């Protein structure tokens, strides 16, 4: 699978062939748990005027709403936006008045309990159960359980400094995988590990969306910051989407500027 940096793209070719542009949220469109900044809002809404856009995030709908949906401009073309939180295990569309749920795949109570127990036990054993946290460490997102070592609302600077080489998260991933071989366990953001049913990841989101739209997977571009084979954006590429790597929202702003400069027709 080929993943290209945003700065290496042939933008003319991309704009000619892509029928939908998908985006990760945290550290792609916005800083973790923070709303999109005005420059991003302006460009994201402008992109909706030109093409179909998908938002595929590991976060739950509440976070997606606060970071993106609540800050869209009043005239944004919400009908062009496909919202797929928790890695596509939920799917929402705008019905003219609100974001309506199309489908949801939620974990059973027994599975939630088993995953939560494994995450806490191994985090403690590995010395990752930090004393200073900002919010809950373990969050049930319905179709995904997420462990956040510093809590759900930790400052971005603290999260960035916690596991710069990803060894802490990967150690927890491997330990939980051994307990729950039937589940998919992946490193998420700076401090997080996501656990979901096998097959319910961003590859699933890409397959569901491209089937819904009646397009090929390679007619979808997916932009994210976690594009290594162990990252939670990489499954989108494994499903056939064109992978584009950014390092932060500032890169994404420049990517959007380049895309918007090449669009000169109304939404398809």
Report each predicted region and the residues it spans.
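Acidic di-acidic motifs
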Residues: 24-26, 198, 224-225
């Amino acid at each position: 699978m080929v993943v290209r940096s945003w700065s290496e793209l042939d933008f003319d070719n991309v704009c000619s062939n892509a029928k939908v542009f998908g985006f990760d949220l945290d550290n792609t469109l916005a800083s973790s748990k923070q709303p999109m900044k005005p420059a991003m809002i302006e460009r994201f809404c402008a992109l909706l005027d030109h093409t179909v856009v998908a938002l595929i995030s590991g976060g739950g709908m509440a976070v997606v709403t606060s970071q993106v949906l609540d800050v869209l401009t009043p005239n944004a073309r919400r009908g062009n936006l496909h919202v797929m939180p928790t890695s596509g295990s939920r799917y929402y569309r705008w019905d003219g008045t609100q974001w309506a749920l199309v489908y949801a795949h939620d974990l059973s109570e027994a599975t939630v309990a088993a995953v939560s127990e494994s995450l806490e036990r191994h985090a403690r054993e590995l010395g990752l159960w930090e004393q200073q946290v900002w919010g809950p460490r373990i969050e049930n997102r319905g179709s995904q359980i997420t462990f956040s070592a510093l809590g759900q609302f930790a400052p971005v600077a603290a999260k960035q400094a916690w596991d710069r080489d990803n060894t802490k998260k990967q150690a927890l991933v491997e330990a939980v995988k051994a307990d729950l071989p039937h589940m998919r366990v992946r490193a998420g953001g700076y401090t997080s590990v996501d656990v979901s049913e096998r097959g319910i990841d961003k590859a699933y989101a890409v397959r569901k969306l491209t089937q819904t739209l009646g397009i090929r997977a390679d007619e979808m571009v997916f932009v994210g910051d976690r594009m290594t084979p162990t990252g939670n954006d990489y499954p989108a590429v494994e499903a056939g989407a064109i992978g584009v790597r950014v390092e932060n929202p500032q890169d994404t702003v420049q990517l959007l500027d380049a895309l918007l400069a090449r669009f000169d027709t109304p939404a398809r």
